[in-house]
Amino acid sequence: MRGDSRLRTTEMSPAETLDLAEFHGDGISAELSEAVHHVAAQLPMEVHFHPVDLSIERRRTDAEGSYQDAEAAIRKLGVAIKYPTTTELESPNKVLRDRFDFTVIHRPVQTIPGVPTRYAGKVDIHIVRIAVGGTYEDAGRRIGTEAAVSVRVIERRPSFEASKFAFDLARKLKCDVVSASKYTIQRATDGLFEEVAEEVAATYPDVQHHAELFDALLAKLIMESEAYKVIVTPNEYGDFLSDAACGMIGSIGLGASASYSFDRDGRVKLAMFDPAGGTAPDIAGQGICNPAAALLAFGMLLEHQGYRALGGALNDAVRDAISAGNTTGDLGGSLNTMGFTQEVCLAMKARLTGSVNL
């Protein structure tokens, strides 16, 4: 059941429910799911998870069946949370992206006090990435033994949907939009992307916009990260930028992302939320993984579904727990997965009851 767009409070009916698909994967997937379920149980509402097995074991014997189950679940419910999956014969992320027609990926990256980092500046950016095209759609082919070639594609519709999402987000955040590509070199492909971004910008007179060359943006982001808030880019540029930004805040394990598909009127039709990290097979099953990104992804899901107060409280609670030094071993702390999750629940309760010192 989708929440409305109004800011919700903790004064909800206990009968209010949220149904979502839950895509289980590999490695630490089960531990991340347990953390998300534990947090969901503390919310003043009922959350119903509808599980789908996307593990490598099932995909080895029934890959098509696993993807069909995932597609049926998200099309019925409209929203899903996904945990890390192993890439073997195919990338499950790409398969799902193609089946669900995901054209936009949104990755927020924000400095968290208390996380050791080699970067002294403050990062608080939203990376909006076209989820298709670029150099990722064509693996290319060899020409003889000494050369290879691949085709790079930029399409108008995904460029429009990513740009519109970025401008809607900037309007909500009251900030400007930077579109970034190599439009002076890739004049046809990146030129089309920037052309579409300009067309969308013209329909948002209240949102400032300018284009920057992607390589220059990387340098300026490091030198003056506070100058950037919403950045929209083609596929591979957004991929590079997302990981670089997570490195600037000290850990790729602190990144969550959302993937979206849209109807003909530009409204979000399907949404999937996932932690950015991998399956971490070296620590799987030990109960010591960091669930922060999975919890942040769940917070994004709650906000998307209209439960803005709850989603915001959860996102803030993750940051509160880490800032207070209540962290897992990868961030220098001593807590295990569930110990950190419990600290997040305490911080979330304090946020929702107004007893936290802001």
Report residues per predicted region:
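Glycine-rich phosphate/pyrophosphate-binding loop and the adjoining helix
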Residues: 138-139, 143, 147-179, 183-187, ...
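Glycine-rich phosphate/nucleotide-binding loop
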Residues: 222-326
